[in-house]
C-alpha cells in the first residue's frame, strides 16, 4: 500500500519470515526515488498481511489482516511511518480477511471484509463492519454478512480507487489457484454475490 504523508512516500507491505512462514507489516521509504530496505513496523506473534491504512479525524490508522488471531486488530500511527500502537481488538472469534474502507457516514468508517468457506478457503463471502467513536473510545459495530453465497471473487485486492468513477479492486481466484487475477469494477455497481460489470479486462 503506497502512502504519502509529511513529505514522505512509503510503501506498507507484508514481510514474511521464510523460516516460520509468519508475516509482519513492514515499511519501505521511496521518498528519494529508490527503494529502501523494508523495516518491520508492526510485529505480533501471529501472521499479519494486507496493511490497510486510512485517515480518521486527522489521525492515521491501519487495519491489517490478522485472521490468524481470530480478531480485527486496529493500530494507530504515533510517528509516521515507523511507530505504531495498538488502538483496539474487535470482533473476537471472527476470521475476517482483507478489510477495505468502503464508505464514511457521519464520521463512521464502514469496511468490507471477507470470511472463508470452512470447507474451502479459496471461497469467500463478504462481511461488513463499522468503526464508531463514542465517549472518547473506538467501538466496532458488526453490520453482518453482505452476501450469503461463497464465491471465488468475494474478496478485495486493494483499497477503493477514488477517482471520477470510483473503482473497487476485486481479487479473483480459481479452484486451487489463489489470486489468479484482479478485476476493476465500478464501485456503485459492484454488488457482492451478483454479476459484476468489468471495467478493465482481467
Regions found by a protein language model. Give the residues of each.
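Carbohydrate-active catalytic/glycan-binding domains of CAZyme proteins
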Residues: 1-202
Amino acid at each position: 500500500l503506497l502512502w504519502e504523508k509529511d513529505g514522505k512516500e512509503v510503501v506498507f507491505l507484508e514481510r514474511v519470515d521464510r523460516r516460520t512462514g509468519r508475516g509482519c507489516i513492514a515499511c519501505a521509504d521511496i521518498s528519494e526515488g529508490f527503494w529502501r530496505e523494508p523495516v518491520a513496523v508492526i510485529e505480533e506473534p501471529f501472521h499479519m498481511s494486507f496493511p490497510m491504512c486510512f485517515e480518521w479525524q486527522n489521525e492515521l490508522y491501519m487495519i491489517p489482516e490478522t485472521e490468524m488471531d481470530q480478531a480485527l486488530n486496529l493500530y494507530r500511527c504515533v510517528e509516521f511511518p515507523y511507530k505504531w500502537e495498538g488502538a483496539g481488538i474487535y470482533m473476537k472469534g471472527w476470521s475476517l480477511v482483507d478489510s477495505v474502507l468502503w464508505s464514511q457516514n457521519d464520521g463512521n468508517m464502514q469496511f468490507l471484509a471477507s470470511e472463508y468457506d470452512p470447507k474451502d478457503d479459496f471461497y469467500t463471502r463478504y462481511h461488513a463492519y463499522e468503526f464508531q467513536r463514542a465517549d472518547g473510545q473506538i467501538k466496532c459495530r458488526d453490520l453482518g454478512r453482505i452476501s450469503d453465497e461463497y464465491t471465488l471473487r468475494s474478496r478485495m485486492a486493494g483499497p477503493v480507487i477514488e477517482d471520477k468513477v470510483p473503482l473497487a479492486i476485486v481479487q479473483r481466484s480459481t479452484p486451487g489457484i489463489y489470486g489468479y487475477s484482479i478485476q476493476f469494477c465500478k464501485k456503485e455497481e459492484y454488488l457482492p454475490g451478483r454479476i459484476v460489470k468489468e471495467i478493465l479486462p482481467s
